[in-house]
């Protein structure tokens, strides 16, 4: 069996694509190729072939490289094609026409209509129409794929009426759940992932301002690990930091390697997931909360169901109103004042990951999908 994985909007070394799925599939396949934006034309990493295409500068650029990625995909003559970005649906069936015996999997990371609806990159006058077009075209074309994988139940529900071959592969962490008490805590709070206003970045700064006004927390340290989602967000946050004298309290690392993210989490006391109540965030499950839990740090997260249910199931953190910076600040202080509570919730998080919310069970589902499509016996 030969597998070809396609992406236009992610790094070939994206956590879900490379570290989780591709590495798991090595258990049943020794010929895996990932084609995606990369500055090297060809490289083999951990036995997986990486074939680079030019990195698009923006969303529009991702559409311009569609023909190229499909041409390269067809050259692979793979048995199973697995693609990860919405725009590829418009060209993916060319693979079927050239290679009628191949199987095609669409991996839906997001609720794309909601994503467009809240996107600052889509001009407001055409946002509603674009949302409708994305919704209708995605469902219509997806009927023709052999399998649809989603990252959560809410997105799966969109596709249940158009396909019987839909499965949730949660983006649970692959990190081993280990608490490392030997690492010195350098940061009081961490937020890891893409930094945007919608994900609560400005609310975090407002909470830090409140905490800093208390002499007990004047030296509080907050680290953001990840890239800014868009330039305007960076401008807004930097302006707020400057106007409120928070330069000594806030650290931005930018994008860091997958393995380094874990080191920052170990060096932090509390993990934040303060996503604002946008429609998309009532459906999608943020991966970062599982990664915090796997490192034994309590989670302070928004009240939306995909976040709340994982926090409350194991008492691994505190649920807050993300629109209320006072609520955020008070609950950060509550944890910082109580080391026993931090330890208790951190230990609960490790238990949750070890027993339930881990990649191992998702790996089994993924491999079974490939076995069915590839005609591989379970014996």
Regions found by a protein language model. Name each.
Residues 4, 149, 181-208, 222-224:
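Conserved donor-binding/catalytic core segment of Leloir-type glycosyltransferases
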Residues 23, 66-74, 94-98, 112-114, ...:
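Membrane-proximal helix-turn-helix segments that form the acceptor-binding/catalytic region
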Residues 37-40, 221-236, 254-255:
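Glycosyltransferase donor-sugar binding loop
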Residues 154, 172:
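Carbohydrate-associated surface elements
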Residues 232-234, 247-257, 264:
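Active-site donor-binding acidic/aromatic loop of nucleotide-activated sugar
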Residues 265-282, 297:
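Acidic donor-binding loop of glycosyltransferase active sites
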Residues 313-314, 318-325, 334-340:
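Conserved acidic donor-binding segment of nucleotide-sugar-dependent glycosyltransferases
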Residues 327, 334, 341-356, 365-368:
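A short, well-ordered alpha-helix in the C-terminal region of glycosyltransferases
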């Amino acid at each position: 069996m030969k597998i070809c994985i396609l992406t236009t909007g992610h790094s070939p070394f994206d956590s879900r694509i490379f570290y989780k799925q591709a590495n798991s599939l090595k258990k049943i396949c020794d010929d895996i190729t990932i084609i995606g934006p990369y500055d090297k034309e060809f490289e083999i990493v951990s036995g997986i072939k990486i074939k680079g295409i030019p990195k698009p500068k923006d969303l529009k650029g991702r559409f311009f490289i569609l023909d190229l990625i499909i041409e390269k995909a067809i050259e692979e003559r793979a048995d199973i094609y697995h693609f990860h970005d919405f725009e590829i649906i418009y060209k993916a069936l060319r693979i079927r026409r050239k290679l009628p015996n191949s199987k095609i999997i669409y991996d839906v990371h997001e609720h794309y209509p909601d994503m467009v609806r809240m996107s600052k990159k889509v001009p407001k006058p055409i946002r509603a129409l674009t949302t409708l077009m994305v919704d209708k075209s995605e469902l219509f074309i997806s009927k023709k794929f052999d399998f649809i994988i989603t990252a959560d139940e809410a997105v799966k529900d969109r596709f249940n009426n158009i396909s019987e071959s839909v499965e949730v592969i949660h983006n649970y962490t692959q990190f081993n759940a280990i608490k490392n008490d030997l690492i010195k805590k350098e940061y009081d709070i961490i937020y890891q992932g893409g930094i945007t206003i919608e994900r609560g970045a400005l609310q975090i700064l407002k909470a830090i301002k409140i905490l800093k006004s208390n002499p007990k927390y004047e030296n509080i340290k907050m680290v953001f690990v990840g890239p800014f989602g868009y330039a305007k967000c960076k401008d807004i946050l930097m302006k707020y930091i400057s106007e409120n004298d928070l330069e000594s309290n806030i650290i931005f690392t930018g994008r860091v390697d997958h393995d380094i993210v874990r080191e920052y989490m170990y060096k932090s006391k509390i993990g934040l997931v303060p996503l604002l109540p946008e429609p998309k965030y009532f459906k999608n499950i943020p991966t970062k909360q599982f990664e915090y839990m796997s490192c034994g740090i309590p989670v302070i997260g928004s009240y939306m169901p995909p976040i709340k249910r994982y926090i409350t199931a194991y008492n691994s953190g505190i649920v807050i109103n993300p629109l209320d910076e006072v609520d955020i600040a008070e609950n950060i202080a509550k944890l910082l004042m109580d080391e026993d509570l931090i330890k208790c919730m951190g230990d609960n998080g490790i238990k949750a990951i070890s027993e339930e919310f881990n990649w191992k069970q998702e790996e089994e589902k993924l491999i079974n999908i490939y076995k069915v499509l590839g005609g591989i016996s379970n014996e």
